[in-house]
Design a protein with these regions (language model features):
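Gram-negative outer-membrane beta-barrel transporters
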Residues: 27, 198, 452-456, 562-567, ...
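Short, acidic, small-residue-rich periplasmic hinge/interaction motif at the N-terminus
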Residues: 27-78, 119, 127
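A beta-strand signature from Gram-negative outer-membrane beta-barrel systems
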Residues: 31, 146-198, 759
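Extracytoplasmic beta-strand/coil segments of soluble accessory domains associated
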Residues: 86-134
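Transmembrane beta-barrel wall of Gram-negative outer-membrane proteins
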Residues: 208-298, 325-327, 331, 394
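Surface-exposed extracellular loop regions of Gram-negative outer-membrane beta-barrel proteins
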Residues: 297, 469-471, 487-545, 562-589, ...
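Outer membrane beta-barrel strand-and-loop segments of large Gram-negative receptors
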Residues: 381-390, 434-438, 444, 534-538, ...
Length: 760
């Protein structure tokens, strides 16, 4: 009943804004010249800002075309994210926040998932360059990492736009882009002095939810001659949720687990500094040197991989238990010539030091603190990239792109390779003193040709070759077609094979986990097992297909896209033992990471944008998932809503005042079908998350030409959800923690926020 009331109230808010906007619309139609005159009176600064925006997406362009979506700096200003940009990226077609499996482990660490392919298949870029810091975090037995992901390295106020690329169009980016790409484009410097200072504060209505404070600055300008620079710094802090936020909502717990609780969302203290020096050494030629440093330290909320606890967990609530230190350095040469030929070349070095308290690696103690001592995981990533774009006017207009990349990842893990042989010795492996080092290289070549066959036909074939030093060769062909159908309709089709190489944990035989039996899929009762890295893994591949039809006229846009990803060789924990220990009274089974032969992801995306008037715009998108399953077992690949509807109604009341309402409706979320031993889920393990909606309101006032103020309310109707535990029941004679099904994350309640942006 309450949900129905909330839906009705949400619609009333939208209709209310329509009711106020309708007479405005009528007045605009009666006096269009007035609006044109007002627009002509913008000052030079405003015009300059608009020109910068037009380079990326003209005002008449829709931001949610099939396969590609764009989020602008203006949208980020009107709807500022609290924690990181994933909060607004999730409102794009095909995007949700999920874990990397159906386990529910680290359930509040949800990350960007595109078209149901999981966070590990979402490639995060900053200014076109990959970010890989999350790979420094250990991969758990079920495929989860205790990480915030890579969406928080750039403060929202420093973002010029965010490009979200889905499906076949993402295949050209190579490793890790099988689901899609999120490209975070930062604001650039100019030839004139400019600076900004921004601050963001929010206040949750419920005191058991963590609040956020953020402030940052930027400065850019000339250095003399042909040199210029850009510098920004950021400091933000989000408090951890209260340790008992889920009290009364947890799944049943007995025996030694009776006093345990699933944790809420952890907090974070984030510090960033980034600088770029640019040299325009010739017409259309530039060289950029960039350096950045970030430190992210968590504020511990009490979370463990299996939602259990010990004294170290209790003693460290609210303290730092892991710290990420990220350094990045790059040199970029961009060149252009009068012929139209352009080139982009860069070298990037990224180093992440993941310093964290030691964790257990066996059974129920996996992912729980085993010591209050810190140990380090160091990940170094080197990337060399070069591409050239060649315009060709032969038979028809073409733009040919040729490129190459070389990437090396090296890891030194002093934390995760220490599991001893509790279940007996493993043939060919040492119980202690295993090497902490692992590495892999990828060499790539790629080509893409944008061929304008006619004024209404664009055909884009592409081919990418990757050689991985461990798993070998991979070919990724692609073909995309855009065909105009008259003046208003466009048909878009694409097919591509995308791929993802195994992680350094999955290929490392020195990375060993142990279970006393509950985690062993095919082992008998009471028989334990090991899980080892596998050097013989294949790369994951996915044949991604989409067909979309789009209608566009006079600011109206409507479209529908069908997508299907035939997923092959997905890497998961093994389903059958490859052997047993060499001695001992009871033989212990040995499993490896293995390739699942086939999986399937399929769904629909729709968009509808309505220009209600010159000042009122209504944008909508919906994603409906048709399939997401392991074709061998029938198991779901992840827990995502059956459908997701995002709707935004924005009204530019005056030149300096705008308001907007947002409405998101999540469909039913179903849990995993089978437990870790392959048996059907039972009892509370089958709990679903019912459909629910989130409504937001915000308003932005440009107080002066240099100061703007945004204030708003997230989750107006206080639609909260609590984490009940992990998906599956675990335990034994000493006690049980019963499964929570899909109820594995927190949805925060009503929150008030204010953001101040200044520039000079």
């Amino acid at each position: 009943m309450n949900k129905k009331i909330n839906y009705s109230l949400a619609m009333l808010i939208n209709l209310g804004i329509y009711g106020v906007a309708a007479p405005v619309f009528a007045a605009e139609q009666a006096a269009p010249a007035t609006a044109q005159t007002a627009a002509a009176n913008n000052d030079d600064t405003q015009n300059h800002a608009e020109e910068d925006t037009l380079i990326v997406t003209a005002a008449a362009q829709n931001l949610q075309a099939p396969g590609v979506s764009t989020i602008t700096a203006e949208e980020l200003k009107k709807r500022p994210p609290a924690r990181d940009i994933s909060e607004i990226v999730r409102t794009m077609p095909g995007v949700n926040l999920t874990g990397n499996s159906t386990s529910g482990q680290r359930g509040n660490g949800r990350q960007i998932d595109i078209r149901g392919m999981g966070p590990e298949n979402t490639l995060i870029l900053i200014d076109g360059k990959p970010v890989t810091s999350r790979n420094s975090v250990r991969l758990g037995w079920r495929g989860e990492r205790d990480t915030r992901g890579d969406a928080s390295w750039v403060p929202p106020e420093m973002v010029e736009r965010i490009e979200v690329i889905r499906g076949p169009a993402a295949a050209r980016y190579g490793n890790g882009a099988a689901g899609g790409v999120v490209n975070i484009i930062t604001k650039k410097g100019t030839g004139e002095w400019h600076g900004t200072w921004n601050t963001y504060l929010n206040a949750p209505e419920h005191k058991d939810e963590g609040s956020t404070k953020r402030t940052n600055f930027s400065l850019n300008g000339p250095l003399g001659g042909d040199f210029s620079f850009r510098l920004y710094g950021n400091l933000d802090k989000t408090q951890a949720d209260a340790w008992d936020i889920n009290q009364g909502h947890q799944s049943e717990r007995t025996g030694i687990y009776a006093d345990t609780l699933p944790a809420g969302r952890e907090g974070v203290i984030n510090k960033d500094i980034n600088g770029v020096v640019r040299w325009d050494f010739a017409p259309m030629q530039s060289l950029e040197l960039e350096a950045g440093y970030s430190r992210q330290g968590n504020l511990y909320s009490g979370d463990t991989q299996n939602t259990n606890t010990n004294q170290i967990v209790k003693d460290n609530y609210g303290k730092e238990t892991n710290r990420l230190y990220r350094q990045s350095y790059s040199m970029t040469w961009n060149g252009g010539w009068d012929s139209g030929l352009t080139t982009s070349n860069w070298v990037q070095y990224e180093h992440t030091r993941n310093s964290r308290m030691r964790e257990g690696l066996a059974g129920g103690t996996e992912g729980i603190f085993s010591s209050d001592k810190f140990s380090d995981i160091d990940l170094s990533d080197v990337l060399l990239h070069s591409e050239v774009n060649i315009p060709i006017d032969f038979v028809f207009n073409q733009n040919l792109t040729l490129g190459t990349e070389w990437n090396q990842q090296k890891m030194k893990d002093l934390s995760s390779n220490g599991q001893t042989f509790m279940g007996g010795p493993i043939p060919g492996s040492n119980s202690t003193n295993r090497s902490p080092y692992s590495q892999a290289e990828i060499f790539s070549l790629f080509a893409e040709d944008n061929m304008e066959l006619t004024d209404s036909t664009m055909l884009t074939p592409g081919l990418r070759f990757d050689h991985h030093s461990i798993v070998g060769n991979n070919w990724s062909p692609s073909l995309n077609l855009s065909q105009g159908l008259g003046d208003d309709f466009t048909l878009k089709m694409g097919i591509a094979q995308a791929y993802k190489a195994p992680s350094l944990y999955q290929t490392n035989p020195n990375y060993i986990l142990y279970s006393k039996g509950q985690g062993c899929y095919a082992s008998g009762t009471g028989v334990g097992c090991y899980m080892m890295g596998n050097e013989d893994l294949k790369a994951e591949t996915s044949v991604n297909k989409e067909i979309g039809l789009e209608f566009k006229r006079d600011g109206w846009l409507a479209g529908v896209t069908w997508f299907r990803n035939d997923y092959k060789d997905k890497i998961e924990a093994g389903y059958a033992p490859i052997g047993q220990t060499s001695s001992g009274k009871t033989k212990t089974d040995i499993y490896q990471w293995e390739n699942i032969p086939k999986a399937l992801v399929e769904g629909l995306e729709g968009t509808l944008n309505v220009p209600v008037s010159n000042t009122v715009n209504w944008t909508n998108n919906i994603t409906y998932m048709l399939e997401s399953k392991n074709k061998e077992t029938g198991e779901r690949l992840s827990v995502i809503p059956e459908y997701t509807l995002n709707s935004t109604l924005s009204w530019q009341i005056r030149q300096d005042i705008s308001v907007q309402s947002t409405f998101t409706w999540y469909g039913k979320q179903q849990p995993k079908k089978y437990n870790y031993k392959g048996l059907p889920a039972t009892g509370t393990e089958t709990n679903e998350v019912s459909p629910y909606s989130i409504v937001g309101l915000s308003g932005t006032w440009d107080a002066t030409k240099n100061v703007s103020l945004t204030t708003g309310i997230d989750n107006v109707f206080d639609e909260r959800h609590w984490r009940a535990g992990n998906a599956q029941t675990t335990g034994g004679n000493a006690g049980y923690m019963y499964g929570a099904g899909a109820e594995t994350y927190n949805e925060s309640g009503r929150t008030y926020y204010v953001s101040v942006n200044t520039h000079f």
